Amino acid sequence: MSLIMNAEQQYIDLFSQCEAMICRHSAEALNAPRATAFADFERQGFPTRKQEKYKYTDVSKFFEPDYGLNLNRLPIPVTPYEVFKCDVPNMSTSLFFVVNDAFYNQALPKSGLPEGVIFGSLRNMAEQHPELVKKYYGKLADTSKDAVTAFNTAFAQDGVLMYVPKNVIVDRPIQLVNILRADVNFMVNRRVLIILEEGAQARLLICDHAMDNVNFLATQVIEVFAEENSVFDLYELEETHTSTVRFSNLYVKQGANSNVLLNGMTLHNGTTRNTTEVTLAGEGAEINLCGMAIADKNQHVDNNTSIDHAVPNCTSNELFKYVLDDQSVGAFAGLVLVRPDAQHTSSQQTNRNLCATRDARMYTQPQLEIYADDVKCSHGATVGQLDENALFYMRARGIAEKEARLLLMFAFVNEVIDTIRLEALKDRLHLLVEKRFRGELNKCQGCSICK
């Protein structure tokens, strides 16, 4: 039997043996699609590089080692509210934690959220608001089309529910900190369900942190429903470690005249594969999809995106930038689909990449599929090195070569940082990126919570 088959078989056997336990420690709404998801995973198997969608990241090999799972939901001995120090000072947020893949319910502070807003354990909220969760959970994350999503849906037992009622504006940003902490090599399967009803507005910052003395594998599925006239910002900041592998699938559906900003920033990692699928389902919807990756050593960052212009009069703006050093590898594949009836579409996709060494590798694959004739669509991708003329100019004016290189790299990614609509976060990212380029930011330094 091949290693790949062994990897699949161990989880097939595990689910078959532990399905009752998995369901017992979850909620009915999460259990409802579980059997179908498992069957979809069993049929598809782990993705390999032979599949076009996963050609730049061999997902299957990362599931071959043995990982521990907390299917019995044993409590983790950690008190995040006592030891966590936010990496973004001067930003007042409503702060919540997920420890491994369980929402931390103990010692919750007063969140200060407006009346009717829900932010809490997906498992608990599915028991308190079953009809709400059943209506949305799993409706965007199609397990028949993606094996990682199927795997996550089969094994996920908890996560986060964020619900903002009609016309409610959440002025204070919400911050969710994902913590990976264990004594053995460990796997987590996280789930996030986000619902903004008509006219609602909110901003969410998700921060990923991990301890560095064990190997982690994390799967994550996020579903976002942005209804008519809603406004939503989602920022993801990854500061984990070289021993962390993360597969994150983000699904977004937007209603008419909704405005969504997605910005995923990888400052430090091991292996990261992000899949983002956006459907513009209502006229006048606008998506701004941005990403930034800074990688060195043998780090690997792969972003695969698709934006589906399903109706007329929608706008999409996409901007991804990578800076790769040493033997790091980056990949970007972005599809923009304009359907036959989606006239008056405006779409712009840009991918710019900087390889600081000859050993760094960047793969880029921009794609446009246009089936309407009255549209404005463009895309562009470049892979290059630092501008030698600019370096010469700066050195001629007394700037040391190392400092000149740092300044050029910082200026290169600054465009992505400037899309952030939270000033405190934007200011902090400028500092964190500068420290990263100087080699002063090797991983999360916000607290001792993962130690």
Predicted regions and their residues:
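Short, low-to-moderate order helix/coil transition modules at the start of elongated helical scaffolds
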Residues: S2-V221, E228-V231
